[in-house]
Amino acid sequence: MIEARHLRVLRAVATTGSFSAAARELGCTQPAVSQQMKALEASAGTPLLVRTGREMRLTEAGEALVRHASGILAGLTAAEEEVAAIAGLRAGRVRLVSFPSGSSTLVPGALAALRAAHPGTQVSLVEAEPPRSVEMLRDGDCDIALAFRYGTTGGEWDDLVVRPLLTDRLIGLVPDGHRLADADAVGIGELADESWIAGCPRCRRQLVEVCEASGFTPRIDFATDDYPAVIGLVGAGLGVAVLPALAIESVRPKGARTVTVEPAVEREIVALTLPDLARVPAVAATLDQLARAATR
């Protein structure tokens, strides 16, 4: 196999005309130059140099190799510099997938802090709810997935690096003027006869489970993945809802009141990545900034 260090020596010999001059240029000994040239000729399978008097002359094969060496070595140098920039966080790219309420609350502060600390790092953002976002991570379509789960699902993320960020409590949402709008806390069973407005499929399943545990099945009249739409429907008096605190934080409820719901239901917000990706400097830095944003 032809090695880059051998090409550098060959180019120096071709430029200077002798092993001794090449050794001086490269800062090594003449025997070292001779040894590397022998190794290069063995790899090439043909002579690359011939001695003419006191000078070394390139053979046809040597001329061909030197002709390509400059481009090869320049490309290798550029690659080394680019990799060093990525390793040193002077450059890098991170593909982030987040659920909508995470995009509007956690992500902006995290990315602003990342840009301030490492302006050469570029982050792209697309939105997807779990489990789709987790599938994208496993399929190689993103580097970090901001996701959530209710309770603990055994083995769900065992193949991933899980960075816990925060616990997000579900909050009740009722129209202004509702009989429970001024209550300090509301038992979920007190809303058994209400029309319900449900959120994303995973949140919807959790709503049904919580209600059924309290002895009733919610009558879901409207369902939408768009949390501002849920809040708008509640504000219009079309029903009640239970939403994550992050979702309500990102939109000012108009015509609706938030109430504490008992029993408490929480979801775990996490950042997920693959074990190998967790060692990539730009990914690790982004995970750190997401964790910091979650504590603000």
Regions found by a protein language model. Give the residues of each.
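Short helix-boundary/capping micro-motifs
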Residues: 12-29
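Conserved amphipathic alpha-helical core elements
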Residues: 22, 40-41
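A short LG(V/I)-centered, amphipathic sequence patch enriched
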Residues: 41-60
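Interdomain hinge and pocket-entrance segments immediately C-terminal to HTH DNA-binding domains
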Residues: 54, 60, 84-103, 117-122, ...
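Central regulatory/effector-binding core of bacterial HTH transcription factors
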Residues: 91-154, 224
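A late-sequence structural motif
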Residues: 106, 256-296
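Hydrophobic hinge/microswitch elements
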Residues: 129-142, 148, 201-257
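Secondary-structure junction motif
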Residues: 148, 180, 193-214, 279-288
